[in-house]
A protein has these predicted regions:
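Short, acidic/polar
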Residues: 18-32, 54, 79-87, 147-158
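Structural preference for beta-strand elements that scaffold enzyme active sites
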Residues: 5-9, 38-41, 67-71, 96-98, ...
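Conserved, mostly hydrophobic/aromatic
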Residues: 11, 40, 89, 159, ...
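Alpha-helix-loop-beta-strand connector modules within alpha/beta enzyme cores
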Residues: 34, 48-71, 114-136, 179-187
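Active-site-adjacent structural elements that line small-molecule/cofactor binding pockets in enzymes
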Residues: 82, 129-187
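Active-site mouth loops of central-metabolism enzymes
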Residues: 7-24, 46, 68-80, 133-151
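Glycine-rich anion/phosphate-binding loops
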Residues: 74-91, 111-116
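Glycine-rich, proline-tolerant flexible connector loops at the mouths of alpha/beta enzymes
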Residues: 37-56, 102-112, 166-185
């Protein structure tokens, strides 16, 4: 089992109103930042539905000098759209990304579109080089779509092989599965 202290981060969904955004930036973020998280992350919404509000929240938090990672899920976006967003993040000094497959709206996906998280990681790494620290999702209790433990491990390894720097998990209830997961990753 790893003896390294776990990193804690806080995940935001972009507020729908200006009042909610103001509260998130002026009250919530400073209060949570006092707990010394490794970073904050901001979700992207299914199919990039919150793309603009994600960018605004991420930029404001970054301008306050706080480490923030936008979620980047392709959700059917083509490589040009994802590449343009990566260029914008780089120009704004964003160095950490959370690369996810994300929830795909029905009817999305196709030959010119990224389909799996490892493809997105490889695309980010190819386009941005070492500029970005790429976080990916990991599932100590096994991804709901995984056929087996082994297939889930293979997917995780594929993301790391594609260029991911580290993996994050969501809150979970089975602490034993988390420690088993850490042992598996260390092996």
């Amino acid at each position: 089992m790893s003896t390294q202290k776990p990193r804690i981060s806080f995940e935001y969904f972009p507020p729908k109103t200006e009042q909610g955004r103001d509260k998130l930036i002026s009250t919530t973020t400073p209060a949570l930042n006092a707990l010394d998280p490794a970073f904050f992350s901001v979700t992207y919404g299914a199919g990039g539905s919150t793309r603009d509000t994600t960018l605004g929240v991420v930029s404001t938090i970054r301008d306050a000098g706080i480490d923030v990672a936008p979620h980047l899920s392709f959700g059917g976006d083509d490589e040009n759209t994802v590449g343009s967003l990566l260029d914008t993040y780089q120009a704004r000094g964003i160095k950490r990304l959370v690369a996810l497959r994300g929830d795909m709206p029905s009817g999305m996906g196709g030959p010119a579109q990224l389909v799996y998280a490892d493809e997105l990681v490889a695309f980010i790494r190819e386009r941005c080089g070492d500029h970005c620290h790429i976080e990916v999702a990991a599932y100590p209790e096994i991804h709901p779509e995984a056929k087996s433990d082994d297939s889930d491990q293979g997917v995780r390894k594929g993301k790391v092989d594609a260029g991911a720097n580290s993996a994050i998990t969501q809150y979970l209830f089975n602490v034993d599965s988390y420690f088993d997961f850490l042992d598996l990753c260390a092996a």
